[in-house]
């Protein structure tokens, strides 16, 4: 028995130690594909199948998501081709038949997307402060019509919890453990002020993990029992399966006055071993626009081996903030001679390379290629666990 206990402890420590060894193999340069990717407001990305990805736009009130074909070099992970194939599903969950259509809801501001199963996606709406599950519809107009499933999940939050344009920007899905992850972009109102160049604060955020397996099991039981729940009641029930952690961002890197300044977590990505990638993004835009920059930092965290932090708890000097490890950082900008400014908002796992390395795909929001100056940039980073 003693030997078994020793072996169990050794195995546990081995797993903990092995969970810290992701490293960047290669950071590839960003690329734009203007001939095959029309100007857009692309803000989130998820892998669907093969080389097809779902991409959401924070300005579209008609397309639920766009189908993108993304091809990478199998040896280096460098982007070879990116193409927008159009959209097949409308924001109300119906099939796009190519005819003019205008939905009843507007202002979704979809920011992130994940594939939760072979038949459903989850999308964040910053405009409605919600996380919502949608069915994946067949792409053929001749396929049988699929109506909304009655047990699709939705979680709404009061807009008063967030500062303007600072709520749900991120989603990640751990398909192995069936966990759905999200985090607010900036500090919640109840927790203080958002970071600015003037106050120099470090945003204190609440990382949230939903036990998707238990949520779906509960919803299936309700459906079998013919229990009809309101959206508000559904959100309350979903919160029973939610666990939270404390995350602290870096402080602003500048103290200059900005016309537009955004500092927050713009995306999450779940790794195969249960760890997460966190994309911290700082965008600084002066009134004259020249001198604008966007600084991105990619961190690795391991919340499953960390102390939890309940939503009702207040931040203090004793708060168990998640330990984070910097994997990569890069800076783009706008000057008289250079127009590389890229506000990266989307991130997901790409393919594995021939040597077993993992590709991370990132996309930026060009604000519809603002003023003809910005571009829809894409980027890949190759990581490996050794």
What does each of the following model-derived ranges do?
Residues 1-21:
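Bacterial Sec-dependent N-terminal signal peptides
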Residues 20-386:
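Sequence/structural signature of beta-propeller domains
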């Amino acid at each position: 028995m003693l030997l078994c206990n020793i072996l169990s402890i050794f195995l546990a420590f081995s797993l903990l130690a092995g969970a810290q060894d992701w490293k960047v193999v290669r950071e590839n340069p960003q690329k734009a594909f203007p001939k095959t990717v029309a100007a857009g407001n692309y803000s989130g990305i998820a892998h669907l199948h093969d080389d097809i990805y779902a991409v959401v736009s924070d300005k579209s009130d008609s397309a639920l998501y766009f189908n993108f074909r993304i091809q990478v070099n199998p040896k280096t992970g460098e982007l070879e081709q990116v193409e927008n194939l159009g959209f097949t599903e409308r924001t109300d969950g119906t099939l796009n038949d190519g005819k003019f259509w205008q939905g009843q809801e507007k202002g979704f501001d979809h920011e992130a997307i994940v594939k939760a199963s072979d038949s459903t996606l989850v999308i964040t709406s910053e405009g409605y402060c919600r996380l919502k599950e949608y069915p994946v519809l067949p792409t053929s107009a001749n396929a049988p019509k699929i109506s909304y499933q009655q047990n699709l999940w939705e979680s709404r939050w009061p807009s008063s919890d967030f500062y303007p344009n600072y709520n749900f920007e991120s989603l990640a899905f751990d398909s192995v453990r069936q966990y759905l992850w999200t985090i607010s972009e900036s500090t919640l109102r109840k927790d203080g002020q958002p970071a600015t160049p003037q106050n120099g604060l470090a945003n204190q955020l609440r990382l949230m993990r939903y036990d998707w397996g238990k949520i779906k099991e509960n919803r299936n039981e309700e459906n079998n029992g013919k229990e009809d729940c309101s959206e508000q009641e559904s959100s309350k029930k979903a919160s029973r399966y939610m666990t939270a952690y404390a995350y602290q961002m870096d402080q602003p890197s500048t103290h200059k006055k900005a016309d537009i300044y955004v500092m927050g977590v713009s995306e999450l990505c779940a790794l195969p071993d249960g760890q997460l990638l966190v994309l911290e993004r700082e965008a600084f835009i002066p009134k004259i626009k020249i001198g604008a920059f966007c600084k991105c930092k990619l961190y690795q965290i391991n919340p499953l081996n960390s102390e939890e932090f309940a939503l009702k708890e207040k931040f203090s000097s004793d708060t168990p903030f998640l330990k984070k490890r910097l994997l990569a950082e890069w800076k783009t900008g706008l000057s008289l001679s250079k127009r590389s400014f890229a506000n990266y908002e989307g991130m997901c796992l790409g393919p594995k390379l021939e040597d077993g390395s993992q590709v991370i795909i990132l996309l930026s929001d060009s604000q519809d290629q603002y003023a003809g100056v910005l571009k829809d940039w894409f980027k890949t980073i190759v990581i490996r666990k050794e």
